[in-house]
Structures are given as C-alpha cells and as structure tokens.
Amino acid sequence: FCRRDVSHQSVGAQILGLARHNKNMFTRFVENISEEKDWCTYWEINRYNKPAPADYTNDKEFWYNLNANFDVMQACLKKYQWTGDAGYLTDPLFTNFYEKSVNEYVHRWALEPEKIMDRSPYMNQPEDFNPNNNFHTCRGLPSYVENFRGLTVGVDLLATMYAGFNAYAEMAGLTGDDVKMTKGRTQAEAYREILENRWWNPDSSFYQTFWTEDQKFYRGEGVPFILWFDASENPDRIRASVKDILSREWNVENM
C-alpha cells in the first residue's frame, strides 16, 4: 500500500464502500511517523503493517517522497468530509502526524517558504552517504518525479504543500483552534505565492516544474498537481495548464 496511491485513490475507495479499509490504511501510515526516520513514515507497507522491502532497509536507508505527508493530510480531510468520522480530526495518532508534519518535518527537510528554494538535493543522510545507493539519494525526494538528478524542489511538491497546509487549517478550524487555522492558511498562501511569482513563465505561458541544485528551472512532469490541489486561482494560468497537459503524453503517475 503506497502513500501516494492510497491518498489519490481513497475517494474512489470511499464511493465503493471501503471507508473502513481507508481508515485502517491511513491509521497505519500516520502511526509510523518517527524522528528516527526524520519525521517520515513508511512509503509503502504490506498487509502486516511492515515496510515493503523494495523501499526500505532500515530507518536510515529507505525510499521516500517528501510530498507524502502533505498528501495524506489533504486526503484525511476529504475522508472526514465524506464520512463525518471525527477520528480524522481528533485521534491522537492523526493529530500527532499532522503536527509533526507541519512543524518538525518541514524544519528537518528545509521546506519552509523562506528556505525551500535554497535547499540541498540530499539531506539527513548517513555518514557513509553513497550517491549510487538509491536508499540514500531517494531518502527524501522533493517530488513524485523520481528520475531527475539534482532536483531540489518539484512543482508538485509546492502544490501538495499548499494542499496539505490548507487541509491543516481547515481541520484546525473544525476543532476550534483559530491560531493553527491562521498558521495553516498563511503558510499555504506563502507556497502559492512562490508558485505564482517564481514558477510561472510568462513568455511561454506555462509553469516550470523542476528547480535544481544549480538554481535553474527545467521542464517535465508535475503540472497536473497544480490543478488537482487548486494551487492556482488564476483562470488564465489554469486554462494554459490544461493546454500544457494535453499537449503531450505523460507517465501515468503524473496524472
């Protein structure tokens, strides 16, 4: 069970009557967050709630896409909206995951709005860091794109963080915590401002998708996440992004 896939397919699962299965999977994901994994959880688990060997050796060597925590947060809000299950808002396993994700996790991986464009492609690595070991180089991928070397931020990460912080704000509002609600909305808007002010290319009428360690933009996958997470409010840019998506064939994981 993959965090990205569960997050993106859980509404369909709900429609099929699988609310109990959704709750079980999200519970397993949120309960496995830990400082030893630098506030990541497991990228994929099996039916025994164990990390999939294809993605995990130990807490210092594993595969993880940084979008995941925020994707789970927005998905959990949707599950509450579909089910009315207050556990998504108040269960200590879930609230601990939300708080660690918007605080310690963001700090540990230099994802704050003021730092995200200057972060390193490889962070929180073991002393014996091996650039040829995928469980070193992919432990904290800043995108769902997994094959672009030197990537420090993907546009999909920005969009997912926008959605995650918005979800955090809405859940805080539902539980009467106005301070956290304001914090979430403010930080979500900060990511949107970065997207609109720095990632939009007015000459070509598209969003850039990759930001790299050499401080340059490149183009590739990621634009659908801007629309999926409502990260842009600009009608002209939204229409241009739809045109951009339709202009070529994409990897299914980009859709």
Cite the ranges covered by each PLM segment.
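Substrate-binding groove/exosite segments of carbohydrate-active enzymes
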Residues: F1-L77, Q81-L89, V223-L227, M255
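Active-site core of glycosidic bond-cleaving carbohydrate-active enzymes
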Residues: C2-S34, P92, N96, N103, ...
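Short, flexible helix-adjacent loops and helix caps
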Residues: S34, Q81-Y88, A110, G173-D177, ...
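Proline-centered turn/helix-capping motifs that create local helix->coil transitions or kinks
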Residues: K37-D38, W109-P121, W199-S204, A231-I238
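The feature captures the catalytic groove of carbohydrate-active enzymes
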Residues: W43-D71, A86, V106-T186, E221-F225
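Structured segments of extracytoplasmic/periplasmic soluble domains
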Residues: R28, N32, A75, W82, ...
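Internal, well-ordered domain-core segments that constitute the primary functional module
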Residues: L77-H107
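Short amphipathic alpha-helical coiled-coil/interface segments
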Residues: M181-W199
